[in-house]
């Protein structure tokens, strides 16, 4: 019995492709590594220039839980658990482990309404201004590489719109991109699979991720491109009687020795494996200019090449016996290259498509305005090494070798993104550093019925993974008249004029929960 599975291309594939044999035995796969194995633990550094960052979207069920309360503020037991967690405001750090300077920090949440692209004012999120005074008590000047961390996904880079100033002058920065900040898991109820993304759900997840400095140290490394040889089959020049068969499908079938060959795919909607014959079938709806589908279609073979393949057209994506049709054709071009080169070509095509047809990719298309193909490619290679078929233990989400989801999620998953710049603190003197960006809140979904539809949550970490020695920290709220504070462990009391408070650097975490004040209407 043929085991067919539906790739995660929701709404695109015929019912005949839905999972029919979940109990089929697991297939053994070889583990493919880069020749430069030492590079596997290193990260990518983006090119110089101003960067743009944002958070937003579903973050997974989590908490904006507080630590011990001070300043007569609420404690952890009073904090709200949010359905979508946006991550905390993180402190400035340096690439140097012992920078030799002290720091005073002041963090402000500005609740001025934000004007959206349509011109409407929205009381959603806050502008964060995170300021530092660095003091050099030594008898020599100290030059530091500053790393300002922001939680976000690459797809959101335009909306956060951060800036860093040094001594009042806007600094040129490099964007340094960290790994995916979350993990993988099942759907609950005893499901032990790793099919689903599990975003960080509370501040302690970021504490576990960043504590000890390994994440930051990895970020500052350099990644070597994947130079392993591959054979690429590119499919073009599509033809089919789509007027008669609107879901006309092209299938390519072959057999491989799975201990010697691994196949990655892009642009294919269907996959099947016949456990009796060992035949593997990849299929795609023939592009007709009407259906939303990718034009770029590739099979990337790592290891032993295919010994042959057959092409067959079908009425629809089910690819069932008896539903073969004539008139379905394509051109298949075979080429030999490296994994890096084919992924780089794919990244160029994806980013070009995002620019030409942003509606197809939605919010992901914003990445095309920020990310260059070379950086995108290195991030995709890194994801393949960590979670895909270049990993010792691929997660279920990516173990099919389908690159479509992996390439999209490289752009969308939450990470810690660093703005990198340099500063010299003169002997006996100071340097002032200010980072500013828009911060999305944690929230509950409007349709959840939780009763917290308009509640917004914000978190702040005082010293997490910072190399700086803090001597003082304070926090403030600006334009607090626009919001009502419903929960906190900070100590703000705007109604009585308390809009700035001292923080305890020894307390790792502070939280703030607000609701917009309803506006009077005419």
Q: Model-flagged regions — what are they?
A:
Residues 1, 5, 39-40, 127, ...:
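Generic structural microfeature
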Residues 27-53:
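Internal signal-anchor transmembrane helix that establishes type II topology
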